[in-house]
Amino acid sequence: MVRYPAVAGSFYPADEELVLMLERFFSDLGEEGNDRRITAGVAPHAGYIFSGYTASRTYKAIFEDGLPETFVILGPNHTGLGSPIAVHPPGTWITPLGEIEVDGELAREIAKISGIADLDDLAHKYEHSIEVQVPFIQYLAEKAGKEVKIVPITLGIQDEDVAEDLGRAIFEASRELGKDVVVIASTDFMHYGQIYGYVPFRARADELPHRIKEWDFRIIRRILDFDVRGMFEEIREMNHTMCGPGGVGTAIVYSRLAGAVEAELLHYTTSFEVSRSTEAVVGYASIVFRR
């Protein structure tokens, strides 16, 4: 089963400019490490011109800590297609950088252990939130001279129960199979503006990014404390428009089970820094969890 790119040429370049862009993002990349302390990371999934640098901070940290055997990538289902909790079946994903294999053995085991996940490719066909993560992984795997696999999982339902089920299923499946895994939670934070139906406050252009950051940091503080329930409580209280809390919650649950004891915010920004528009502003964060 082959999954072809759906957003190459829109969210990220479809030609040689992609490599040039990744080289700029990773211009400060160090040597690949072998500590393997990182259990999971959070990375945004907007167009690379807006959030690519922030996402690169997550992958830089993982590379310098040591690449895993498999990345389990969780992203929100924006299209509404397919199974509510969809693990991509065995197969291959293609991007402008080439092919990357789905870890079919791990995908099947996660779906078997989980009480809610199905093997389903339809949910992934047009979804961008996972696709935009893949070129970062391919680029760094090439740098390291390693073959790295992925397990893409889309979430159409996002709550504490989903996070608990999936986080535990990923941990138990990887332990059962002896797989070295890093979980990636693909999410953007606040989506501010009439286009998103979310204008919880008004502010001058020079104040708006700071106000958005304040609201996002109420959630980020909970994430850094490994507090899944508190994160969802903050989201509900603010009616916050973070799009991938289920994946973040899953990453936290998995990380706790995998022995993580600390989390670090590596980078935060908003789309305003590029667009200079206050009509639609989105927050982006890079976070890693470590043993």
Swiss-Prot record:
Pfam families: Memo (PF01875)
Domain of life: Archaea
Alphabetized InterPro entries for the sequence: MEMO1_fam
PANTHER family: PROTEIN MEMO1 (PTHR11060:SF0)
NCBIfam families the record matches: AmmeMemoSam_B (TIGR04336), PRK00782.1 (NF001987)
Protein family (similarity comment): Belongs to the MEMO1 family.
Protein name: MEMO1 family protein TK1477
Species whose genome carries this gene: Thermococcus kodakarensis (strain ATCC BAA-918 / JCM 12380 / KOD1)
